[in-house]
Amino acid sequence: MSRLDRSRYAALYGPTVGDRIRLADTDLFIEVTEDRSRGPAGTGTGDEAVFGGGKVIRESMGQSLATRAEGAPDLVITGAVVLDHWGVVKADVGIRDGRIVALGKAGNPDTMDGVHPELVMGPGTEIIAGNGKILTAGAVDCHVHLICPQQVPEALGAGITTLIGGGTGPAEGTKATTVTPGSWNLARMLSALDDWPVNVVLLGKGNTVSDESMWEQLRAGAAGFKLHEDWGTTPAAIDACLRVADAAGVQVALHSDTLNEAGFVEDTLAAIAGRAIHAYHTEGAGGGHAPDIITVAAAGNVLPSSTNPTRPHTVNTLDEHLDMLMVCHHLNPSVPEDLAFAESRIRPSTIAAEDILHDLGAISMIGSDSQAMGRIGEVVLRTWQTAHVMKLRRGSLAGDDRADNTRARRYIAKYTICPAVAHGLDAEIGSVEPGKLADLVLYDPAFFGVRPSLVLKGGFIAWAAMGDANASIPTPQPVLPRPMWGAARGPAAASSLIFVAPAAIEDGLPGRLGLATPVVPVADVRRRGKADLPENTATPDIRVDPDTFTVTVDGEAIEADPVSELPMTQRYFLF
């Protein structure tokens, strides 16, 4: 029997069990723990599905006679290393009707052993070569200010396929508060987003004690609420909003009271009263009770997230935040009270603790805060920069030895499955699993987390790193992230989802607005807690000294030690 050494096999088919892959230029490595592309127990080793001249996927060889009507997949991604919250495996990934059908071995069972019954390729099957590449779920940005439509291509180019947030454009309310308020604005924004290849979750305004005003927004397409201090996040407003959310089954995102005008963090937790809530920028630089909002990450009912400008803590983090705050919250640096408000939110001690809490899995999600103290194109990148810094500082996590699979699974969950679970989207998106929408991102390992090779939306290529369109082949420079056919109006809508409250479906919203994008209800999230967020369930004791702002986690004081150098930076970007 002919044999291949490990390096030759990897060159032909991609890495297999026991091979390690470096993530971009970080110090993080993942190791393949299972190779499903070789069939059960390796029964198909030697005839792995590979496309090209003289290769396997040809008529009566790797390609069978199966028609689409007989179940052949529409698309197979061959030999990709799937990195998800549940593991690191190599597999052929089959897609049909825009959804993942199986992870296994693709091929022709008439000529090949170990072919998965859902991955029998026929003449109607398209192929993407994932060999040697990393495949992840599309990112879910859980904190988006919809300030301008140009954010969408930036997001897609960074591997983001779902946007959770709100806004109406560059209005002062939107620039500050992630809210699409009222039925008229919701209808306009749903119509505007109908043509884009992204899934959408709009948040209505929760800062009111009027139940009917909140129900009106739910019937009009809001899939949850945002409570923001700029609209007045009082204990009464928190309680009223959560009462309606409990009845409607939707999530509430919280930006609490930085100035402690209506109460302190203890009062906010008392108003929440053990109910599920998504705490935005839990560290506090983005807003929230100063100086100790970070302590809410210890509560099991609080689903905590970060926004990316504080990820990770660097020597530049503090300096850029003051200017960002002034712009985003309509403050005047010549007014002493405005300056004090801004300075109260920027604390090196809590930013340093945020790093540690992410590595422990105590802060569970990362979003952007797009154009409102955050960058929509850097959610994925800054997540992995944080993981890199934490490995350097804290060493390998328990369970990691030759590679960093445990840490990688924890960090990828922060922008995929965890926000999907928090907002009731996980039945549809958030992971690479059969039955879910095929929102997938394919990376060359050297560019992992920096620049995707392909972004699939509902199983159709929407964005790609593409060379000169007038060239004779696809690869000549300049290679730029560009829209593909899946970003065109028809397939963009057909391949995406608009998530709304169940009340909107019951009220006939889809027919009333005439949207091309399928409209689906969010799942009831009111009984969900941090224990439901994969790989990010920790609830350590967190305390903040009110005088020095020193943070202790399970009794250990966290020292601020900002880094001066990061991976995934100048090696990849000119600016």
From Swiss-Prot:
InterPro entries: Amidohydro-rel (IPR006680), Metal-dep_hydrolase_composite (IPR011059), Metal_Hydrolase (IPR032466), Urease_alpha_N_dom (IPR011612), Urease_alpha_subunit (IPR050112), Urease_AS (IPR017950), Urease_asu (IPR005848), Urease_asu_c (IPR017951). It is found in: Cytoplasm. It catalyses: urea + 2 H2O + H(+) = hydrogencarbonate + 2 NH4(+). Binds 2 nickel ions per subunit. The modification N6-carboxylysine is found at residue 226. Pathway: Nitrogen metabolism; urea degradation; CO(2) and NH(3) from urea (urease route): step 1/1. GO terms for molecular function: nickel cation binding; urease activity. It is an enzyme of class 3 (hydrolase). Pfam families: Amidohydro_1 (PF01979), Urease_alpha (PF00449). Its cofactor is Ni cation. One of its GO terms (biological process) is urea catabolic process. HAMAP family: Urease_alpha. This is Urease subunit alpha. It comes from Frankia casuarinae (strain DSM 45818 / CECT 9043 / HFP020203 / CcI3).
